[in-house]
A protein has these predicted regions:
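Short, hydrophobic/glycine-enriched beta-strand segments
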Residues: 23-29
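Acidic, low-complexity terminal tails and accessory targeting/binding regions
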Residues: 18-23, 94, 107-118, 180-232
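Active-site metal-binding loops of divalent metal-dependent hydrolases
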Residues: 30, 165, 172, 219
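Phosphate-coordination/substrate-recognition cap region in phosphate-metabolizing enzymes
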Residues: 60-127, 193
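Sec-dependent signal peptide recognition
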Residues: 1-7
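Residue-level preference for the first positions of well-ordered beta-strands
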Residues: 24, 163-169
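Hydrophobic h-region of N-terminal signal peptides that target proteins for export
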Residues: 9-17
Length: 232
């Protein structure tokens, strides 16, 4: 029986070795004044540039990943994400191809963009945003379900490609939705895995529906980035 058992183990291990796996790095864009103002504002797809801290943090994220194989960087078309992707690429030790990817653009907050959160959501809608995101409806905007659908299309495209690794530079709402997809969690858990500005996550992809999070929201390097890159 022992030779048969050994053969079975060999067959099973060969299947394991042949299992297709890919790696996704996920980076949230750097800080903007809309994030850090005493009364923060809804951003979405309006153009808000990175502030000095945001630029320093992006450079630090690039340093953090400098020796990793990060593949192509797929970035949201919104300039703050492109600016963040550029900083990361500039501080990587190898050549990095940057690709604008419409499927990872920020959620459209419709008529709420540019307003303070209280102006946009008030008490009633704000309650849905915080406590019942699955019920949230944004006039002239997007639902979280629509965001999930387009992110799944990105997964399909990446999975079917020859690429083994990629990096996504996107936005807070997108990283929240991605965390739900990685964990197969319901939209009610939208706020459970929040990523800080310029946080970095690494995820193993086993299929378009199966993922393992290796680490989430690494950000310990940001303070060092402030010391190194902020103007005195």
């Amino acid at each position: 029986m022992r030779p048969l058992f050994s053969l079975l183990l060999l067959i099973l291990s060969s299947f394991s070795l042949c299992e297709k796996k890919k790696i996704i790095y996920l980076i949230r864009h750097g800080e903007t004044n809309f994030n850090t103002d005493p009364v923060p504002k809804v951003r979405g797809r309006i153009n808000v540039p990175l502030n000095e801290e945001g630029i320093a943090h992006c450079k630090a994220a690039g340093d953090f990943l400098a020796n990793e194989n990060i593949g192509k960087i797929y970035y949201s078309a919104i300039p703050r994400a492109k600016q963040s992707a550029d900083c990361v690429a500039e501080h990587h030790n190898g050549p990095v191809e940057l690709v604008e990817e419409p499927l990872v653009i920020d959620i459209s907050w419709g008529i709420y963009e540019g307003k303070t959160y209280m102006e946009a959501f008030g008490d009633e809608t704000g309650g849905d945003l915080i406590h019942h995101p699955e019920k949230l409806i944004v006039p002239e905007g997007e639902t979280f379900y629509a965001v999930m659908d387009r992110l799944r299309l990105f997964f399909v495209k990446f999975w079917e490609s020859d690429e083994e690794v990629c990096t996504i530079v996107s936005h807070g709402a997108i990283t929240n939705v991605l965390s739900l997809m990685f964990l197969q969690a319901p939209l009610e858990k939208f706020w459970s895995m929040y990523m800080s500005a310029c946080g970095v996550s690494k995820v193993q992809m086993k299929s378009i529906y199966s993922f393992t999070i290796e680490y989430w929201n690494a950000n310990y390097f940001l303070k060092e980035g402030e010391k190194k890159y902020l103007k005195k």
